[in-house]
Amino acid sequence: MAKKKVKYTFDYDSKFLNEHNVKKLAYELTHDSDTSNKILDCLFTAEVTDEQIAEATGIKLNFVRKILYKFYDVGMANYTRKKDPETQWFTYYWRFDSRKAAQILEKQYNHHNQEIKESIEYEENNMFFVCPNGCRYPFDEATEFQFICPRCNEKLEFKDNSDLIHDLKKLESAYKINE
């Protein structure tokens, strides 16, 4: 029997929320894309219990709970606790939190984007010198070492970094989100 594709719909509007980004975030938390994707599929289907997720996915209950708690710890999943009047046991109903996931993704995006910008600025504002073994130093350090590599005692030669700057700018433009 063919598995039905789950449609990821979000109750919060954000340029960062899409199925790819959510699955990537889940993988970063769990380092297990197959399992986390199955659990996410359940969370996007309805508000579900951990037992229902385990039954639907075939994943052991304790492993389902472990991943749900990882999602909960960062805020991308929440639960409602309800007490069974007969057994007096609590049942936890889990759901995906679109708003918090969007905030996490936006924070990650801003962090990575800032790192790229800082790298471009650093590369544009410095000249670099390398030894035959690939050790790389900015001009200030190279002059301190009298253009001799402190690691291998080889001569440091100027290295044009315009290709690296070009690649970083390409990465920066590819990383921008359409607004």
Curated annotation (Swiss-Prot):
Record organism: Methanosphaera stadtmanae (strain ATCC 43021 / DSM 3091 / JCM 11832 / MCB-3)
UniProt keyword annotation of Transferase present: no
Any one GO molecular-function label of the UniProt entry: DNA binding
Designated name of the protein: Transcription factor E
Disulphide-bonded residues: none
Record GO biological process: regulation of DNA-templated transcription; transcription initiation at RNA polymerase II promoter
Alphabetical list of InterPro entries matching this protein: TF_E_archaea, TFE, TFIIE/TFIIEa_HTH, TFIIE_asu, TFIIEa/SarR/Rpc3_HTH_dom, WH-like_DNA-bd_sf, WH_DNA-bd_sf
The encoding gene: tfe
Note on domains (UniProt): The winged helix domain is involved in binding to DNA in the preinitiation complex.
Subunit comment: Monomer. Interaction with RNA polymerase subunits RpoF and RpoE is necessary for Tfe stimulatory transcription activity. Able to interact with Tbp and RNA polymerase in the absence of DNA promoter. Interacts both with the preinitiation and elongation complexes.
Role played: Transcription factor that plays a role in the activation of archaeal genes transcribed by RNA polymerase. Facilitates transcription initiation by enhancing TATA-box recognition by TATA-box-binding protein (Tbp), and transcription factor B (Tfb) and RNA polymerase recruitment. Not absolutely required for transcription in vitro, but particularly important in cases where Tbp or Tfb function is not optimal. It dynamically alters the nucleic acid-binding properties of RNA polymerases by stabilizing the initiation complex and destabilizing elongation complexes.
Top-level division of the source organism's lineage: Archaea
Keywords: DNA-binding, Transcription, Transcription regulation
Similarity comment text for this entry: Belongs to the TFE family.
Domain HTH TFE/IIEalpha-type stretches: 1-102
NCBIfam families reported for this sequence: PRK06266.1, transcription factor E
Pfam families: TFIIE_alpha (PF02002)
